[in-house]
């Protein structure tokens, strides 16, 4: 027992010296990277018209917001079925009320005028539209049974390991990145 105590004391002293030598190093200078102020915004509850976008961007600029995370694909079922998009898509179904109003195009145009970046928020696997397209791609339990809905709307998650789902979700990301001048 005495040998172990001696060993532990020596180990503690060695590690203390190592810590002291590391902490004795001169401090690095603070990065000159400008701070970003970000906001995440849901489309269905905030934007129905071009005017809504303009007002929002004016406020964002006033409060020095530098990045807007814009929900471009629905992930809940309270306003719009999940998986429906808010931009002109050839891949995913377009949400009701957005066939003639491309929120992503509008937000990018207005935000970039004020030097505000726009990041496309694209939820992936809570996707009723994908489940309609690929009914066998529903998430399953470890024993192979379909998962039960987590709410009264009957909403399910699609399986992220399913190759068809992966291809579908990636095609949405590619479409956005090719078609729009998003910043992230």
PLM feature spans:
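Positively charged n-region of N-terminal signal peptides that target proteins for export
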Residues: 1-4
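Sec-dependent signal peptide cleavage junction
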Residues: 15-29
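Aromatic- and glycine-enriched glycan-recognition loops and surfaces
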Residues: 45-63, 90-114
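Active-site-adjacent "subsite" loops/lids of carbohydrate-active enzymes
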Residues: 31-38, 44-46, 125-180
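Glycine-rich, aromatic-flanked loop segments that form ligand/cofactor-binding clefts
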Residues: 66-72, 103-149, 184
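Catalytic domains of carbohydrate-active enzymes, especially glycoside hydrolases
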Residues: 52-79, 179-182
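N-terminal carbohydrate-binding accessory modules
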Residues: 25-39, 51, 59
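Glycine-rich, proline-tolerant flexible connector loops at the mouths of alpha/beta enzymes
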Residues: 72-96
């Amino acid at each position: 027992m005495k040998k172990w105590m001696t060993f532990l004391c020596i180990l503690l002293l060695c590690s203390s010296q190592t810590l002291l030598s590391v902490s004795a190093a001169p401090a690095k200078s603070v990065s000159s990277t400008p701070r970003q102020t970000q906001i995440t915004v849901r489309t269905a509850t905030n934007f129905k018209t071009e005017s809504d976008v303009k007002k929002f961007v004016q406020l964002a600029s006033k409060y020095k917001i530098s990045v807007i995370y814009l929900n471009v694909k629905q992930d809940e079922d309270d306003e719009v079925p999940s998986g429906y998009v808010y931009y002109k898509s050839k891949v995913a179904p377009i949400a009701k009320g957005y066939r003639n109003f491309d929120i992503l195009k509008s937000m990018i145009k207005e935000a970039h005028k004020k030097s505000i970046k726009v990041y496309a928020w694209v939820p992936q696997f809570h996707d009723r539209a994908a489940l309609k397209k690929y009914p066998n791609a529903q998430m399953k339990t470890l024993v192979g049974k379909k998962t039960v809905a987590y709410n009264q709307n009957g909403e399910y998650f699609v399986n992220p390991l399913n190759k068809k789902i992966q291809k579908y979700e990636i095609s949405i990301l590619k479409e956005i990145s090719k078609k729009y001048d998003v910043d992230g």
